[in-house]
Amino acid sequence: MPELPEVETVRRTLKNFVLNKRIISIDVIYPKIIEDDIEEFKNKVCNQVINDIDRIGKFLIFKLDDVAFVSHLRMEGKYHYVNSDEPLNKHDHIIFNLDDGKQLRYNDTRKFGRMKLVSLDNYANELPLSKLGPEPFYADEKKLYEKLHKCNLPIKHALLDQSIIAGIGNIYANEICFAMGLDPYTPASKLTKKSVKELIEVASNILNEAIKQGGTTIHSFSANGIDGLFQVKLKVHLQKKCPICGGEITKEAIKGR
């Protein structure tokens, strides 16, 4: 699943291609991707210019003239900016036809991704974005400590809870726990104020470094066909030996993750 660094990489890449392009029409091949009424979505989005693309957590926000829409890539969603005469891939589900004669195609092998209309000026306070916690970069130490202090979930599971802290998924939760020397099974409520401060710093540093490397390319992630490089810096996720002691890394699921 694309996490914060991967979605940020997609955002930056897409801005290079589609900013200031007008959406002429939309072809909806798999309607369930769009949570709104299809005709309403088309009517509000068509003939609008893509003025900016924002990101909150793992969500992209396409900011148009009068409206915006949220795009959640979920497990394997991705965008391709292609010539309009390029043959459709069987996993291309939403096609945005642009005024430069090209197409922005939403491709999703699993079909789990979703799009939803939101207001242009207040989208952060509307669902699904309003239920998100802060990203590590903006987390308040005191508020995060109070949240975790009331949480008896394993710390790794708490890191995956987007209402507590936004943008972290399985890959970076593993890396954060390792960098802190923190047992993933440790109850979140056991973290001290000092540990929470360290957690914010470590998480921010790891995510920032991953963004610099263009994210982690594992399985299906790429930004318009451009792979990220952070996978070569992973310490424990999908690794076999500990980079510090050389011991074998064992894989265990925590709350199914």
What do the predicted segments below correspond to?
Residues 65, 69-167, 172-173, 177-179, ...:
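Phosphate/anion-contacting hairpin/loop surfaces
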Residues 22-41, 46, 54, 70, ...:
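Basic, nucleic-acid-binding surfaces and adjacent catalytic neighborhoods in DNA/RNA-processing proteins
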